[in-house]
Structures are given as C-alpha cells and as structure tokens.
C-alpha cells in the first residue's frame, strides 16, 4: 500500500487512507480494481464507521474500504430510505411466502451449522471463485470479526415436533449504524430453488430498521453492468452516492460516465479529497 492521506477532521482525523495496489476486479470481468482503505482498524468504532459508510465505505471483517479504481466509477453505494419504501407486488408476495421463517438475532458467533451452509452456498453460487474453499478461519475473519455494533441473524423453519430446531434456511450479518442498518453478507440454502431468500432478507431488514427508528438500509454497491447486482435496483426508492452526494437513483436513467471514463474522486467525510 502507498501514499497515506490524513483526514483533518475530528474524530476522523486519527484515520489514514491508503490506496491498494491494483488487483483483478471481482465484479466486472477483465477489469482492474483498487480500493481505498481506512486505517487503523482499531480506531473505527460504530460512530466513525457510520460516517465512513455515508461516504461510500464498506467493511470485510475489520478491513474498511471503498472502490478507488483508475478510470472506473461503476460501483455506486446505494441505500433504501425505509420511510418511503414502496414494495412491489412481487416483493409483497415474497414477504408473505416467507413470513413463517423464524428470525433469531444474536451477537456474532461461530456455529458449525452456519459454516456448513456457507460452504454449500459458495460451492453452488460461486464455484471456482476462491470463497468455495474458505477454511473456518477465513470464514470467521470475513464474517465474524467486527469492532462495531454487528449482529448475526439466522432464519429457520418453525420448530419441528418434539422441539427440534427447524431447518436452517438463511444466515445474514448486519451492522447497526447511527442512521440505519448495513447489510454485510447473506447466504442461504442453495438447494431451495426460486425462493428469493435474498429479497426477503432485505425486506426483513427494512422492517427492522423501521422498528428501530433508523431511516436507512445500506445495501452496499450497485453495479449497472453486473447481473449479480441487479436485484438491488428492485427496491424503490433507491438512493445512490454520486459525486459525493446521496440522491434518488433511477437505475434505468442514472447519469454515470461509462466504465472507461476518467474517475472523479469522491470526497472523504468532511469534504476532503483523497489521493492514491
């Protein structure tokens, strides 16, 4: 990593921002990516992380980053304003279909059943991508390490006769921010076809945010050119962080430069520009 950039704004002034070396993009084939990383990780508490998320950052374990690619700004941070959210007919149908699932919220913790489901999900959905070979340690580093207010949510069928726990269908990790919930990662039973568990999970998070009095659910990055990201555009209204400002996003008409256009550096929190 090179070129630390200090951010002269308390309490974020203690952080430094680095640009990583180039690496293959995991979203667009043939593209080269870079990330901007916020360090040191032990200083990033929930309040600071909230400000970073509002500036387009995400986390993987204790690694806090945002896209910082040369000549590309395809990744758009998106969030749902829960007070204005209007579900589609399909989303209402998915909500009714899965409402019998029992959601249990707990602190982050390791569970062998969760790990087994994670590996089945990766093998079915992302075979050959590397994550389908994650060890238990890698799984824990990716999903169970956090220095902020994070929760694990498991979704099961109703308890079986005799009190046995119902079948595990889905596991989701979320962060609780000062202004919303942030969806970290979700995996589910890959053998259940056409279930739209991912859609249901976001609907569940929207309802949770409402119940907690939080205005947003942050969905990470939406990439117009990536079919895997298409589902995020189905939640309306959707806000995107473009040129440093959150604005209502029309995925069909959003005015983004083409992937090969020159990168306009998004400002860091407080209006300061970063550098690689």
From Swiss-Prot:
GO biological processes: ubiquitin-dependent protein catabolic process via the N-end rule pathway
Function text: Functions in the N-end rule pathway of protein degradation where it conjugates Leu from its aminoacyl-tRNA to the N-termini of proteins containing an N-terminal aspartate or glutamate.
SUPFAM superfamilies linked: Acyl-CoA N-acyltransferases (Nat)
UniProt cross-references to PANTHER family, sorted A to Z: ARGININE-TRNA-PROTEIN TRANSFERASE 1 (PTHR21367), ARGINYL-TRNA--PROTEIN TRANSFERASE 1 (PTHR21367:SF1)
Cellular compartments annotated: Cytoplasm
Organism expressing this protein natively: Burkholderia cenocepacia (strain ATCC BAA-245 / DSM 16553 / LMG 16656 / NCTC 13227 / J2315 / CF5610)
Key words, A-Z: Acyltransferase, Cytoplasm, Transferase
Protein name per UniProt: Aspartate/glutamate leucyltransferase
Enzyme Commission code: 2.3.2.29
Molecular function GO labels: arginyl-tRNA--protein transferase activity; leucyl-tRNA--protein transferase activity
Disulfide bonds: none
Membership in a protein family: Belongs to the R-transferase family. Bpt subfamily.
Catalytic activity line of the entry: N-terminal L-glutamyl-[protein] + L-leucyl-tRNA(Leu) = N-terminal L-leucyl-L-glutamyl-[protein] + tRNA(Leu) + H(+); N-terminal L-aspartyl-[protein] + L-leucyl-tRNA(Leu) = N-terminal L-leucyl-L-aspartyl-[protein] + tRNA(Leu) + H(+)
GO cellular component: cytoplasm
Enzyme class: transferase
